[in-house]
């Protein structure tokens, strides 16, 4: 029984595996067209490392769904980005050391991260550190809500599952998410940032043939 948590730059993607069987759906839309083919049931929300923090009209701190993407990326990447992101908040809080990316070959600029969050902190009348804490908490809350949608709302108790956290930012938020959901066990694989790529290369290939019945539109 596993709940997967994949946090990349743009989104946090969660899914559920119960009794060894991954959750699937049979109705999706692609570019406005309905697809009646089985697919993994993945719930994606805008709470990735590059998700931008902002303040709404009620002066409440929000995160996502807009993202800084890979280019220019978070402010701390020093590639032209200036808006505060979840990654910048993690840098300010010391959760992402300067040598963390590409074994130190991709430097992290702490001052740019601090400057990006300071703009929000001034509007919120809070310290930069407390604003960074708020950004991380909001992002984690969005993820918790997404996991509850695929577990609690479908009759599953998250505390009976293991949280499998991966992606570049998955391990950074795994503990807060697990604590909020009552999950007792968190599994973080080696090299979590490239787990999806490794899975793509190492997974077995299978071929499934489906036909649809035009009379009742049922897949068999």
Regions found by a protein language model. Give the residues of each.
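Single conserved hydrophobic/aromatic residue that forms the stacking wall/gate
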Residues: 210-219
